A protein has these predicted regions:
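PLP-dependent aminotransferase class I/II
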Residues: 1-162
């Protein structure tokens, strides 16, 4: 069997996109072809507008989600501009939050976990309590260019009600 998509079996059921399954053998992500390259080149015409929408959506969240008791926003540097591909927050009761958002038709994801928790990287397991602490409460919420103002407000209101 060919290993694809970093070694993740995409056919096995899971709650979160890529954070629950043990990866026994690492794989690679080599699926760019000429057609994908042409589509990517064509999309460059729109990249500034799309990234601006991500950034503006993140700023909206920054403003609306600050000072909530169960939510901690990630610090932002004044010296850097994030493209806001993800909008990650820390949530007290993260797993309950993810279930709550799912029941209200909003997808959330942990997106990433420590690599050394998987068998294929077991020889590199280390004690990193700061990373463990970060991973225990972090979750990403939708921030993409495709979100409407109504959808952003819906997400914010759900979070405030949690």
């Amino acid at each position: 069997k060919l290993l694809r998509w970093y070694g993740i079996d995409r056919n096995s059921p899971r709650k979160d996109f890529r954070c629950e399954e043990n990866i026994e053998e690492y794989g690679y992500k080599f699926h760019m072809n000429d057609i994908a390259a042409v589509i990517g080149i064509e999309q460059l015409k729109y990249v500034n507008d799309l990234v601006s929408k991500h950034i503006n959506n993140a700023k909206f969240y920054d403003d609306q989600l600050k000072n909530l008791s169960k939510i901690t926003l990630l610090p932002r540097s004044d010296e850097a501009i994030s493209a806001s591909w993800l909008y990650t927050i820390h949530v007290d009761g993260r797993d309950e939050f993810m279930n709550y958002m799912s029941k209200n038709n909003v997808m959330t994801s942990k997106v990433h976990e420590r690599n050394d928790i998987h068998d294929c990287f077991s020889e590199f397991r280390s004690k990193v309590p700061g990373v463990d602490s970060f991973c225990s409460s972090q979750v990403s919420i939708p921030v993409g260019w495709w979100l409407t103002s109504d959808q952003l407000n819906y997400i914010v209101n759900l979070i405030k009600e949690f």
